[in-house]
From Swiss-Prot:
Known EC number: 2.7.7.7
Complex formation: Single-chain monomer with multiple functions.
Protein name per the record: DNA polymerase I
5'-3' exonuclease domain residues: 177-269
Amino acid sequence: MAYPLLVLVDGHALAYRAFFALRESGLRSSRGEPTYAVFGFAQILLTALAEYRPDYAAVAFDVGRTFRDDLYAEYKAGRAETPEEFYPQFERIKQLVQALNIPIYTAEGYEADDVIGTLARQATERGVDTIILTGDSDVLQLVNDHVRVALANPYGGKTSVTLYDLEQVRKRYDGLEPDQLADLRGLKGDTSDNIPGVRGIGEKGAIALLKQFRSLDALLEQIDAAPKRYQTLLREQAEAARFSRQLATIVTDVPVQLDLEAARIGVYDRSAVMALFQELEFGVSSNLIKKLPSVVQAPTLAELPADLPAAPLTTAPTQLSLFAGESEPAQPTAEPPPVTIVRDATALADLVSRLRNAPAFAFDTECTSLQPVASDLVGISIAIAPDTVCYIPVGHQSETQVPCGEVVTALAPFFANPQQPKFAHNAKFDMEVLAGAGIKVSGLAFDTMIAAAMLGKRQGLKDLAFYELKLPEPPTTIEDLIGRGNKQISFAEVPVEQAAPYAAADALYTLRLTERLQRQLEAEPALHDLYYRVELPLIEVLTDMELTGIRLDQEYLRELGRHFAQRIADLVERIYQQAGGPFNINSGQQLNDVLFGRLGIDPRAHGLSKLKSGGYSITAEVLEELSQLYPIAADILTYRQLTKLKSTYIDALPDLVNPRTGRIHTSYNQLGAATGRLSSNNPNLQNIPVRTEEGREIRRAFVAEPGWRFVAADYSQIELRVLAHMSGDENLIAAFQQGLDIHAATASRLFGVEPTAVDKNQRRVAKTVVFGVIYGISAFGLAQRLGIERDLARQLIDNLFAQFPGIRRYIDQTLEFGRQHGYVQTLFGRRRVMEDLRASGARRAAAEREAINAPIQGTAADLMKMAMVNVHRALREQGLRTRLLLQVHDELIAEAPEDEVEPAARLLRDVMSSVYRDLVVPLSVNLEVGPNWDEMSPLAMG
């Protein structure tokens, strides 16, 4: 017989688990409010409700001092103080429970465990089964035929839940029954709750005693029958055992009364939950909304909790607001207007007429691939006004639609008109898809994705629309239309009638978000200027770079692959010979067996500590150290390097060549790094090693077109020049202004010698110290890097600060600004949130290291982006055919016809060196030219 089911939630236990499990994620709203614990709690709770599908649910919370504290002053003593960030999130957790209309139970003088134990007993008496959802194993003592425990362990962003019934409890505790677990804690104690137990008896011994005597009382009555090693302990600490059991026993007669009708699932106001999720900026991608219980009926006004916050909720006053003076909250959006599907010439002509009179429009594309250059256009959506939205299908299968060529002819003039502003979300992607169909986009006036990222918001359109526009329900996702995994179909297979509302909504959301995000940027003048001066025009630059791509010498790469394969085979043979036989070199376990077993290497002699699995982590650093004594370690390290390069680049790159263009088209993430730097993927061309011969061999495969040359322009020591400007250090500024070798000049001051007397080692040390300091290195870290004593490393750092006091001043001022504001910023106002500067211990130390470097690295990234925009514009204005291809670290790589090499190089140097004239030190640009990415020669120009 199936009984009704009640889920009882240990609110405090789950809240704490979620807080500490997800703390490192740093999840926050764009206003700076920490939300990671709320998210983790919601994820556990809603997943459980979706999986167990209970009829009823209730939550119990602790309320402070309990009878156990009165019995034992040291109860739970020694626990770390609850971090401040927990409390506002705990209030949000209670708001979530209230919004779901789940009753909350508390009892003065009792813990949540006691309340849960009482409610579970009452449920059983009323013929209702119970699942207790908790993160605390103490409640396993409550398990019986009608009570189970779902024990949640949310770590690393994922939640593992184990459901314990009687059999599972017996398995965990080697045959003990749940009603023996309080006795177990009475014997072994509990360090987490500071329950003493019997000193000298651990869990293994306690379980053995309870299996022999069944109960603590029976054991204490027959101490003489216990193993001799325990007899004295038990006689001397019998009262401690009984007292510990009393502390560990969950009370089941707390003065609370279970109200099943109030606990019925599905009687809640869904809009209140939506409002809370929007306030916390939990979007569609989190999947929380899909896990919400179905609304059986909305609660009456009398049934709603009196203290349920009105929607939209306001930010707790204790939280930092990064956007003071933000525009007014959006009002909930009504149902989107009907979409016009442009299926024939008449509808297309009507759209053209509307576009002719439109002051601006938002657009979006649907296509067949996530790789825009390799994709086919399926449809275009256009929003001219909130009530004028259309979808133009051009590539759906078996559908009546206007031929793509006719659509392109009709719409291309509007997209190409620079005087007609256009808005998009992830415009670069859509512009590349349209370019493939023959439509060039000019006049891009706003990209909501880039604006959202600069404002510290989540960048997905569906998430952004949901919480910024206060949509009553989450938008349809692409997975809702095309499915997932093996069952996924192409968008071209989606019927137009289903595709149109989805596609048109994206354009409409973009139109509405543009107005809202524009106002938010206007409230932040520095970000507003950076957005319109750098990030927005950069979109066109990156679009052109990605569309251009770079040529790959595939025959050379095939030959290189054969060469690498032979080298790897030779290495494998040599490794086998040294190991005394073949083994799986890629297996960590087998590598452990060979190095520390068969070859007898002592891991402790090299400072290695065991993993939980019992083996040792054999990292590149470990192999580097071992290689000084054992040739096999050097060979294994080389084997790893070669196999990684071969699989990542040599084998993979040919598959990434676009058959339409014969070139590789990497994709740039405009805000891919927290500092604002660009990142690239598919493939990642920024990670190809440059300092090793193998890396240079791979770079040699990237070649210029016949009759063209690569021209590379590299900023020299840009981060140190930025440091000189931002620190205002006179000595550092003077060295750059005089054109000195900065590392030799630094070494001269650091070691107290004449610049001409600085040797190579002193220069190397000075370079390491300076870069280490601006990356927040400690004396310990510097000592390790240089292989010197820590005291000497500290002395070097102190000497640097003494000779360059502006650097010390910059560090102190940056950290103080970060602590006060919760973020640090570049010279141009780009922010990086640094809430952990207010934390303690290792988290604060890590945040301080990042905070010191972020403004420097971020400003260098801003300067590079400005240079890219200016170079792109100058090339066009001067009518040169030269085109930008790559941006790697501090370097721009262009491809120029042979007769344009010198003018292109001069343009690159002049534009890049003058990108920001207010810098107090000159920007120096080194030039190189060559037929491929490796064989580049310095280019000297007057």
